[in-house]
């Protein structure tokens, strides 16, 4: 349902506060030691205050919302008659008054948990009903101006309650230092009645609605947000809102530059002196001996400054990974770690796992390896990526490009093209193992076995496969593809079982499949067993074929799903008929004509001298890179013109002005491409570095 205009949405703001309170008491309930009397009583007092606020909230709703709605609609009655708030308050009072010892506390705790769980199950849907049912009715029976006036009164009533500030403090503060300080202050210097009355009716910044606070926080930089998060629990939760952390620049932040806007003007290369300083920092940090004697020389002082900067960067990265990204990672669009002195492959792997919606990733001149991309382990896990800069990452090999290509996803148009091919070339193959007989297609039917159904459900002689496998139901189990000429040792499968392998797939060479794309060299695929990429999640046949020399061969795949229950194994499975009139496999959404994968616009592998033609051809899988405009392969010494041609043919939007590769390669667009950018470069690989 589309959200209602903010000015007339009378439920969302108060309900946000109420839902926060529900989350807080659930968290406290799980952390309370019921054997400890102090913890037990503190929890009950907190719950009592929370439910008093719930009671106040519903009284305001009854008077200013439900009551007015009942006057105009006869269908509304007894909205808050069965919410059990009074019963819960009585339960808390009983616990505070009557429970005396540890045995009674533990018995009471069991009852308390059951009652709270039951209340929460009813209370949250009740709020949802108000937002989805009563709000539209309000829009129907009241004018826009009337609703604006109602919302103002509701917010004012929530803010004017005497106990609101105290409830906020009681629910937000876990340490008792502030409470002791307040007690001491007011016991020594009591305020006059007049001052107390004024303070009760004053409205401070803590009473502002959450949406207003978020608007204020949006003007703060990351350092200021971190300071605000220490003010109170409420502010701590607000500062962890994803919209405040869309763009991350940890390397700049560690050096005092707290910019956190979009990545504009960051693509220009720094001068060599700046790069040298970053390298010196990295070297000093890695060579630093914590137990070494202190050297007071000028050179040592400069080195200690470099070490302290790198240490600051490392602490900042750890803080982001453990304290910020678990909450806001899905909202992060930009991550710039260029020239980082402290970042490691493990850190990058953790960050990428927490940030699946990245659009701009800059890892220029970092000391990462292929393992940094291990978290990109399934098809389309980072399909929003538009800018990827790996310039100067000398440890990057083809393995990383395999993971990157898989993470970019697969084009919808590419999927549909292969579905048409598959329906015309379906052949049946029988795999018999004792009493189990299975049938699959030569190319694509094996993916049906990746659903959660058991063998007994999938193999039914009377009910052929008719339901397409959509991407929404796909659970991405592991799929192991083996070369039929070089099968794995049985000991290897033990390790796979520990890695939660759910399916096993055997690949056989088939010669009757020809790629539909022109210019294919029809070479066989070799070494699939040794490829790390294909030993991960393999979710699409279109990802295994393309119109280039790397993959113009067919495969017949035979799949055995995870072991079913014993009863299923005892039954003899009948051969399964495959309907040819319908699509057997479906990858993608019918609802959108716009591509959601492989939208990369910028790719720089400058100085990645270990990249080969294999890595370039991997990028053509799944539909190529149709939107790529900028491609920098300067310093990639081992690639050839054939590999470049294969990649360029899969990049129809490539701009020759931003296409860079070694001058010694006789490749595509030789007259219009921009050549090598690394000539006489002091910090990037180049075949002419010594000149």
From Swiss-Prot:
Fe(3+) 2 binds at residues 58, 61, 80, 126, 130. Fe(3+) 1 binds at residues 15, 57, 61, 130. Pathway: Protein modification; protein ubiquitination. Polybiquitinated upon iron and oxygen depletion, leading to its degradation by the proteasome. Ubiquitination is regulated by the hemerythrin-like region that acts as an oxygen and iron sensor. Undergoes constitutive ubiquitin-dependent degradation at the steady state by HERC2. Keywords: Cytoplasm, Iron, Iron-sulfur, Leucine-rich repeat, Metal-binding, Nucleus, Repeat, Ubl conjugation, Ubl conjugation pathway. GO terms for biological process: intracellular iron ion homeostasis; protein ubiquitination; SCF-dependent proteasomal ubiquitin-dependent protein catabolic process. [2Fe-2S] cluster binds at residues 662, 676, 686-687. Residues 202-248 form the F-box domain. InterPro entries: F-box-like_dom_sf, F-box_dom, Hemerythrin-like, Hr_FBXL5, Leu-rich_rpt, Leu-rich_rpt_Cys-con_subtyp, LRR_dom_sf. Its cofactor is [2Fe-2S] cluster. LRR repeats lie at residues 340-364, 365-392, 393-418, 479-508, 576-607, 608-635, 636-661. Residues 1-159 are annotated as: Hemerythrin-like. One of its GO terms (molecular function) is iron-sulfur cluster binding. An iron-sulfur cluster promotes IRP2 polyubiquitination and degradation in response to both iron and oxygen concentrations. It is found in: Cytoplasm, Perinuclear region; Nucleus. It comes from the Eukaryota. GO terms for cellular component: nucleus; perinuclear region of cytoplasm; SCF ubiquitin ligase complex. Component of some SCF (SKP1-cullin-F-box) protein ligase complex that plays a central role in iron homeostasis by promoting the ubiquitination and subsequent degradation of IREB2/IRP2. The C-terminal domain of FBXL5 contains a redox-sensitive [2Fe-2S] cluster that, upon oxidation, promotes binding to IRP2 to effect its oxygen-dependent degradation. Part of a SCF (SKP1-cullin-F-box) protein ligase complex. Interacts with ACO1/IRP1, IREB2/IRP2; the interaction depends on the [2Fe-2S] cluster. Interacts with DCTN1/p150-glued. The hemerythrin-like region acts as an oxygen and iron sensor by binding oxygen through a diiron metal-center. In absence of oxygen and iron, the protein is ubiquitinated and degraded. This is F-box/LRR-repeat protein 5. It comes from Pongo abelii.
């Amino acid at each position: 349902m589309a959200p209602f205009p903010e000015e007339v949405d009378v439920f969302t703001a108060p309900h946000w506060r109420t839902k926060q309170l529900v989350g807080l008491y659930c968290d406290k309930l799980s952390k309370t030691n019921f054997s400890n009397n102090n913890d037990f009583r503190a929890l009950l007092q907190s719950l009592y205050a929370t439910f008093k606020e719930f009671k106040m909230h519903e009284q305001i709703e009854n008077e200013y919302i439900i009551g007015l709605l009942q006057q105009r609609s006869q269908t509304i009655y007894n909205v808050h008659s069965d919410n059990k708030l009074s019963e819960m308050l009585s339960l808390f009072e009983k616990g505070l008054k009557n429970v005396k010892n540890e045995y009674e506390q533990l018995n009471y705790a069991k009852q308390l948990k059951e009652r709270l769980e039951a209340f929460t199950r009813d209370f949250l849907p009740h709020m949802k009903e108000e937002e989805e049912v009563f709000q539209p009715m309000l829009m129907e029976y009241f004018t826009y101006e009337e609703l604006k006036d109602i919302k103002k009164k509701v917010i004012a009533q929530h803010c004017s309650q005497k106990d609101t500030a105290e409830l906020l403090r009681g629910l937000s503060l876990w340490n008792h230092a502030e409470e002791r300080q307040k007690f001491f202050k007011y016991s020594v210097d009591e305020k006059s009645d007049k001052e107390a009355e004024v303070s009760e009716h004053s409205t401070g910044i803590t009473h502002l609605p959450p949406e207003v606070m978020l608007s204020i926080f949006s003007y703060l930089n990351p350092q200021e947000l971190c300071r605000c998060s220490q003010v109170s629990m409420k502010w701590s939760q607000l500062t962890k809102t994803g919209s405040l952390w869309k763009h991350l620049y940890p390397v700049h932040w560690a050096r005092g530059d707290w910019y956190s806007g979009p990545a504009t003007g960051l693509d220009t290369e720094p001068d060599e002196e700046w790069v040298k300083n970053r390298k010196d920092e990295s070297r000093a940090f890695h060579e630093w001996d914590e137990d070494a004697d202190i050297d007071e020389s000028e050179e040592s002082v400069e080195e200690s400054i470099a070490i302290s900067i790198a240490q600051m960067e490392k602490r900042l990265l750890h803080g982001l990974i453990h304290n910020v990204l678990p909450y806001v990672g899905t909202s992060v669009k930009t991550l710039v770690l260029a020239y980082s002195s402290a970042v490691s492959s493990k850190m990058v792997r953790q960050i990428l796992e927490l940030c699946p919606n990245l659009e701009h990733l800059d890892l220029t001149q970092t000391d990462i390896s292929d393992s940094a991309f291990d978290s990109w382990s399934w098809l389309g896990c980072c399909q929003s990526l538009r800018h990827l800069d790996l310039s100067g990452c000398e440890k990057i090999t083809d393995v990383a490009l395999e993971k990157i290509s898989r993470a970019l996803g697969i084009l919808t148009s590419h999927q549909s093209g292969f579905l048409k091919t598959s329906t015309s070339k379906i052949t049946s193959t029988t795999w018999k193992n004792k009493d189990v007989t299975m049938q699959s297609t030569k190319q694509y039917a094996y993916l049906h076995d990746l659903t959660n159904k058991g063998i007994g459900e999938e193999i039914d002689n009377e009910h052929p496969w008719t339901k397409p496998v959509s991407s929404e139901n796909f659970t991405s189990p592991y799929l192991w593809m083996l070369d039929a000429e070089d099968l794995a040792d049985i000991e290897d499968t033990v390790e796979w079982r520990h890695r939660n392998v759910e399916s096993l797939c055997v690949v056989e060479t088939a010669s009757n499949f020809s790629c539909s794309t022109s210019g294919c060299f029809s070479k066989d695929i070799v070494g699939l067993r040794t490829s790390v990429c294909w030993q991960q999640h393999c979710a699409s046949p279109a990802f295994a074929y393309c119109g280039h020399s790397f993959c113009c061969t067919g495969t017949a795949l035979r799949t055995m799903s995870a072991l079913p229950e014993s009863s299923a194994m005892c039954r003899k499975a009948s051969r399964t008929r495959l309907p040819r009139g319908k699509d057997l496999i479906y990858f993608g959404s019918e609802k959108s004509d716009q591509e959601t994968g492989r939208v990369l616009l910028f790719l720089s592998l400058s100085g990645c001298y270990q990249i080969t033609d294999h890595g370039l051809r991997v990028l053509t899988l799944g539909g190529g890179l149709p939107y790529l405009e900028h491609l920098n392969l300067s310093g990639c010494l081992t690639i050839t013109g054939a590999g470049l041609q294969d990649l360029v043919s899969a990049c129809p939007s490539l701009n020759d002005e931003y296409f860079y590769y070694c001058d010694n390669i006789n490749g595509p667009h030789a007259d219009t491409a921009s050549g090598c950018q690394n000539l006489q470069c002091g910090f990037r690989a180049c075949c002419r570095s010594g000149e």
